[in-house]
C-alpha cells in the first residue's frame, strides 16, 4: 500500500511531470483519494478590488478567517469582466481592476452560516473594495455563471486569454 500524497500546486516537480505524461513516461498503478462530505451550505462572494496588492491582503485575511472552509478563490481582471454582457448585480467595473470569486462552504454544520460569514467579513477594510455576498443558492449560481461566461464571451470576440494557473501566495 502506498502512503497518501497530498495535491500540491506550488510548482512543477518530477512526480508531476511523470503524472502529466499521459502514460508516455509510465503508468500510475495506485492512487489515494481524500473525499470530503458535501457541504451543508455555501456562500459565494464577488469582490471588486482596485489593486493586486489589495488582492493579496484580501487573500491573507480570508484564508486566516475561513481556512479549510474556502473551496474556491478565483481571480479575474477588469478586461475579462468587461466583456460579460449581462450582470444581475450591476457591480462597478470602472472603480476596480481585479475581481475575485470566493466560495466558502459550511462543512461544520454551523447554524446561520450566512450570518457567520457576514460577521467575519465585517473586520475587512471594505473602503478599498466592493463586496457582494450571495444570499441564496440561486445567487451562488448567478455569480458562478459570471465567472464561467468569460471563456464563452472571449470566444465570441475572437481573443482568448488562457491563464488558469495555481501559484503559491
Please tell me what each predicted stretch does.
Residues 1-74:
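FAD-binding subdomain of flavoenzyme oxidoreductases
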Residues 37, 46-169:
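C-terminal substrate-recognition/cap domain of FAD-linked oxidoreductases
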Amino acid at each position: 500500500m502506498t502512503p497518501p500524497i497530498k495535491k500540491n500546486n506550488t510548482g512543477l516537480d518530477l512526480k508531476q511531470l511523470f503524472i502529466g505524461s499521459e502514460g508516455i513516461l509510465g503508468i500510475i498503478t495506485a492512487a489515494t483519494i481524500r473525499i470530503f462530505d458535501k457541504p451543508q451550505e455555501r456562500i459565494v462572494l464577488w469582490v471588486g478590488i482596485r489593486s493586486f496588492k489589495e488582492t493579496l491582503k484580501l487573500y491573507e485575511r480570508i484564508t486566516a478567517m475561513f481556512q479549510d472552509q474556502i473551496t474556491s478563490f478565483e481571480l479575474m481582471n477588469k478586461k475579462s469582466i468587461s466583456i460579460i454582457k449581462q450582470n444581475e448585480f450591476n457591480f462597478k467595473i470602472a472603480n476596480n481592476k481585479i475581481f475575485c470569486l470566493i466560495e466558502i462552504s459550511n462543512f461544520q454544520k454551523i447554524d446561520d452560516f450566512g450570518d457567520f460569514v457576514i460577521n467575519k467579513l465585517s473586520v475587512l477594510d471594505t473602503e478599498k473594495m466592493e463586496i457582494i455576498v450571495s444570499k441564496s443558492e440561486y445567487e451562488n449560481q448567478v455569480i458562478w455563471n459570471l465567472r464561467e461566461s468569460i471563456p464563452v464571451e472571449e470566444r465570441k470576440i475572437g481573443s482568448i486569454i488562457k491563464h488558469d494557473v495555481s501559484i503559491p501566495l
